């Protein structure tokens, strides 16, 4: 069962809403049903149990309350829940919805920590169910248990649930750079893999007033220019050619007119492309390997 083509976003509290960032998610993915949640729509559409409402009311931090609503919405509707401080770069590909998913927060800065910035599930999925079960059976008052909200009911809770699963195949965990290429600690992704969104870390940096005027870093945006390279069917040096290309800055369209074994080799280079680095990050664009002018994923 694939993830429903629904995008959820939520905003509660008195702070100005990062509307431009949120619109970037909505407008970049027009084939998705878009569901915006606020205090009014939550009251009108969500039939939340009294016990769960009591837990939400016990939690003092607005970001923690948002996390608590998030779990309920994902369990009931399924779909893709995207934080309000995420900015879209390219549309979400359909293959992402083949299985429930989230990503790591950052493999270097915070190994094994699951990110809640974008999560996607089928309805009644085991992960939101287990998260809600834990919430109902534990004290989630941050000031009392002296645990920060993100660790108690956000990424920390997602990580605990995921790592406790006997069958982890129920969800796909994508690399952090898919959705969080620039971490709030300063670690930045400099590879050539496809980046779908950036995260502006609004609650961490307390910068929601600035998010709507921020620009996407150049090295994450799709390139404006590219170089077309055709590989004929008599080329026996494909590995040497690709080894040379991976050390160059730029965007290369590889048009295959060669044997199937070479096509297979190019497809296998996905991990190599993800780990590419450059000496001149200001001039970095992305490699795009094409199979008969279609992007290979």
Model-assigned labels for residue ranges:
Residues 1-66, 82-226:
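Glycosyltransferase-associated regions of secretory-pathway enzymes
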Residues 16, 77, 206, 271, ...:
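Enrichment for repetitive, rod-forming helical segments
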Residues 22-26, 71, 93, 158-163, ...:
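Short amphipathic alpha-helical segments and helix-helix/interface helices
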Residues 29, 78, 166, 270-273:
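Glycine-centered loop/turn motif at secondary-structure junctions
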Residues 67-79:
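Small-residue hinge/turn detector
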Residues 213-297:
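Non-catalytic N-terminal targeting/anchoring module and adjacent flexible stem/linker
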């Amino acid at each position: 069962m694939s993830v429903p083509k629904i995008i959820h976003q939520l905003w509660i509290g008195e702070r100005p809403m990062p509307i431009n960032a949120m619109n970037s998610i909505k407008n970049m993915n027009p084939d998705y049903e878009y569901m915006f949640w606020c205090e009014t729509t939550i009251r009108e559409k969500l039939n939340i149990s009294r016990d769960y409402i009591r837990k939400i009311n016990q939690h003092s931090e607005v970001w923690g309350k948002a996390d608590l609503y998030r779990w309920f919405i994902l369990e009931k509707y399924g779909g893709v829940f995207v934080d309000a401080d995420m900015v879209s770069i390219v549309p979400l590909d359909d293959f992402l919805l083949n299985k429930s998913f989230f990503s790591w927060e950052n493999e270097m800065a915070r190994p094994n920590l699951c990110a809640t910035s974008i999560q996607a599930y089928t309805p009644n999925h085991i992960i939101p169910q287990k998260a809600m079960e834990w919430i109902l059976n534990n004290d989630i008052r941050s000031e009392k248990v002296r645990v920060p909200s993100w660790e108690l009911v956000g990424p920390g809770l997602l990580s605990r649930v995921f790592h406790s699963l006997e069958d982890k195949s129920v969800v796909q965990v994508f690399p952090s750079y898919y959705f969080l290429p620039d971490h709030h600690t300063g670690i930045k992704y400099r590879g050539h893999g496809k980046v779908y969104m950036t995260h502006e870390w609004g609650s961490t940096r307390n910068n929601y007033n600035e998010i709507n005027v921020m620009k996407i870093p150049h090295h994450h945006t799709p390139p404006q220019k590219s170089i077309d390279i055709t590989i004929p069917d008599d080329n026996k040096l494909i590995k040497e050619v690709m080894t040379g290309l991976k050390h160059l800055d730029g965007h290369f369209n590889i048009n295959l007119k060669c044997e199937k074994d070479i096509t297979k080799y190019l497809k296998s280079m996905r991990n190599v492309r993800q780990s590419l680095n450059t000496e001149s990050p200001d001039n970095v664009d992305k490699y795009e390997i094409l199979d008969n002018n279609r992007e290979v994923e």
